[in-house]
Amino acid sequence: MSDPRVTNPYANPTTATGTPVAPAIVVDRRTSIAFLSHAFLWMFVGLLVSAGVAFVVGESRQLQQFAEGNLLMLLIAQVALAFGISLGINKMSATLALGLFFVYAASLGLTLGLIIGSYPQASVVSAFLSASAMFGAAAVYGTVTKRDLSSIGAIAFMGIIGILVASLINIFFASSELTWIISIVGVVLFTALTAYDVQKIQQGALVQMTGSVEKAAVIGALRLYLDFVNLFLFMLRLFGGGSR
């Protein structure tokens, strides 16, 4: 499955001339805490939506056939939704943005259901627990560290492109060693991105970008959601033997 993070949710919404469209607002500590808590809340709800859809897909052969037969359309829709939410956030209401996020989470649940179904249950549980622990540790680090993690953003996006290119090359070579390397790099990459995103959320960078705590919380939730899902998928590759 292609990495939905390649849609670059780090891009700031701009006008046709390239200037920011959101007004600058002052972000105090209370606003920062409210924003961070809302971002995590919507992220967890999005994960529950994806998990619920993935479970239903795993129990329904008809849904599996539907997802398999429309996989390309699902991937295109996921990319379009990620672009739409990230780049169009200032042109839509917070309610619409949140609704689109949940639609995105549900569509990704369809593809996740297919992926998870191809692994042993023990591997899935181990990958989920490991991803949860690493995500939690990175989130705590991003919250408490005094170190500026700004440089991680640009480096990580280039790393994602590198992973995608390596994955495409590996389709032809089917190298288990390269698969392991890609998976390990992916785990490190999205662990670092989690810390980076949490720090930016706490600092109120997304509130400044969108001019709204509610809208910024949706963008924050999308980023954290993608961090966790990709971390889980790379961990699943490792626990599943790296052959898929």
Feature map (PLM): residue ranges:
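A hydrophobic alpha-helical transmembrane-helix feature that marks the membrane cores
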Residues: 1-244
